[in-house]
Amino acid sequence: MRLKELLPNFLIVHQEVPEDPIAFKSTDKRENENKEITIPELIDTKVPELADGATDTLYGLLVNGHLQTAYGSFRHFDNIYKVQYKRMIIKYPHGGEGTVDFAVNGRSTKRRKVEKEYVPTSQPVFNGNLKRRYSYYSPDDPKLNSDDAKPMLIILHGLTGGSRESYVRAIVHEITTKYDFEACVFNARGCCYSAITTPLLYNGGWTNDIRYCVNDLRKRFPNRKFYMMGFSLGASIMTNYLGEESDRTKIECAISVSNPFDLYNSAYFINSTPMGSRFYSPALGHNLLRMVRNHLSTLEENPDFKDVIEKHLKKIRTVRQFDNLLTGPMFGYKNAEEYYKNASSYKRIPGIRTPFIALHAQDDPIVGGDLPIDQIKSNPYTLLLETSTGGHVGWFKDRSGRRWYAEPLCRFLKIFHDEITVKGLKPDLENVQLPDPNCEPIATTFRAN
């Protein structure tokens, strides 16, 4: 054993792989019938950083999951992974508005002085430093529709986050500048400097908005192939969505990062440690309260929420308290416990029919290390990558904020696109046993009559 392997910042990758992972092969009978490839094989041959037993060294001063996690909260890392966005407004048919931020790095976003910059009447003006990074698309902008065939990555952020988060920008910057992908970030309601227009926010099982967003993007860009990556609560939403869509999937491949697969267990775990109960949970609760205060006038249009806000808002200190009083009842659940148990994304893993990779650090201080390994190993479409360290959406390589996962994950998506999607390889289902896709339904998902 080498000395560096004894260091607490030494990272080791461990894979949890189904016994018979899905193999992709050509449907053209003229091709060599034996020529096929699985996701683990693709990783081992093309992305060795993610192979089983791969090693690396993270930032030496961040010697555990707590420090890796906290470092991402204390700094914004504005000098690295710089991204410019243009924002599209989505008007949901089920009420309210959402926003999608498209990466436009390297493209001219300047307007002539005589041309007034478009700002939707329902949304805030970007001022100060935000104005350098964000602007709005007008609804009739021709760039919102294209016949090009470039691959596009859709990213879902974590709790109260958005396209501005450094963990999101790391992926957006890498995949657009190095791998010729288009990228956009789906901002949840009320997040990332966006205004809500109805008294409704979102939760870890609310898949209606992302479903509408994906369908809308496919209409705008009919020739593109779509990929997904979700972080933390965004990974929960993404996993639930993919499990519900099952073999109707419109996504070529998806990656889940630091997913709280079991919301109930995660809520318990975060409050079971001194750091969790004294720092993480109050910090996340503070972010949720700030989001509510930013949209207070609209939320109070619902008299039930107005009553709760007036009576309890000042008493809320943790995520669980927030979900018990606001999130749960807002979406028809009796309390936080009922919401957590119904919306936990591990329940939708059996329904996934999209090539799916989950990345998780064993020292994640927010989610914990209790992962749905049995469910993942029972689905030939899914694969788990566990690292010995990295924290919750951390994996910092150095002081500058460089992330260990950004380059290899983006390279994997590029290789998957080139070697499987573009070549038209299809999953060989002849000799695999798929789990029953009929998962427990999410109570809040809209269903056709």
From Swiss-Prot:
Sites of the Glycyl lysine isopeptide (Lys-Gly) (interchain with G-Cter in ubiquitin) crosslink: 82
pH dependence: Optimum pH is 7.0 for MAG lipase activity. Active over a broad pH range from pH 6 to pH 9. Optimum pH is 8.5 for p-nitrophenyl palmitate and pH 7.5 for both p-nitrophenyl acetate and p-nitrophenyl butyrate.
Ranges where the AB hydrolase-1 domain occurs: 151-392
Molecular function terms, GO-annotated: acetylesterase activity; acyltransferase activity; monoacylglycerol lipase activity; triacylglycerol lipase activity
Keyword Ubl conjugation: yes
The EC number(s) this enzyme carries: 3.1.1.23
Keywords: Hydrolase, Isopeptide bond, Serine esterase, Ubl conjugation
Pfam families xrefs: Abhydrolase_1
Temperature remarks: Optimum temperature is 30 degrees Celsius for MAG lipase activity. Optimum temperature is 45 degrees Celsius for p-nitrophenyl palmitate and 30 degrees Celsius for both p-nitrophenyl acetate and p-nitrophenyl butyrate.
Motif GXSXG boundaries: 230-234
Top-level class of the enzyme under EC nomenclature: hydrolase
Known role: Converts monoacylglycerides (MAG) to free fatty acids and glycerol. Has a preference for palmitoyl-MAG. Does not play a significant role in ethyl ester biosynthesis. Also possesses ester hydrolase and low but persistent TAG lipase activity.
Family: Belongs to the AB hydrolase superfamily. AB hydrolase 4 family.
Protein name: Monoacylglycerol lipase
